[in-house]
């Protein structure tokens, strides 16, 4: 498998999720399966079925995270500069509305709109990579082409 680029923060977050899932997998789900078995006939036991389904889902996620972490390449903060690169925080201004938005450019595995983390593989992320403060980018959106200006680029 090829290397998976992650920020230090993203790597640590995945490690934490893995620990929590393993704990859940080892204790909570196993206990639920045990309790459901004690209820008797497994063919019509919805608690048992639900616990087994969750066990499969959690087990799959554990394997996925372990694979990502074993192939992870940590992206360290680069030197301060005004170029948009992976891991940098960027502030952009919508040239039509004047609204400003700040987010961090991250890998697809770390993308989280609500945490202000924009995937470098998204249309906006792709258009911003390599750009500098003052540059203007155009992005196709469902409502038409949006124009943004890079206002600020920082490590934090």
UniProtKB/Swiss-Prot annotation:
Residues 1-32 form a coiled coil. InterPro entries: GreA/GreB_C_sf (IPR036953), TF_GreA/GreB_CS (IPR018151), Tscrpt_elong_fac_GreA (IPR006359), Tscrpt_elong_fac_GreA/B (IPR028624), Tscrpt_elong_fac_GreA/B_C (IPR001437), Tscrpt_elong_fac_GreA/B_fam (IPR023459), Tscrpt_elong_fac_GreA/B_N (IPR022691), Tscrpt_elong_fac_GreA/B_N_sf (IPR036805). GO terms for biological process: DNA-templated transcription elongation; regulation of DNA-templated transcription elongation. Belongs to the GreA/GreB family. HAMAP family: GreA_GreB. Necessary for efficient RNA polymerase transcription elongation past template-encoded arresting sites. The arresting sites in DNA have the property of trapping a certain fraction of elongating RNA polymerases that pass through, resulting in locked ternary complexes. Cleavage of the nascent transcript by cleavage factors such as GreA or GreB allows the resumption of elongation from the new 3'terminus. GreA releases sequences of 2 to 3 nucleotides. Keywords: Coiled coil, DNA-binding, Transcription, Transcription regulation. NCBIfam families: greA, PRK00226.1-4. One of its GO terms (molecular function) is RNA polymerase binding. It comes from the Bacteria. This is Transcription elongation factor GreA.
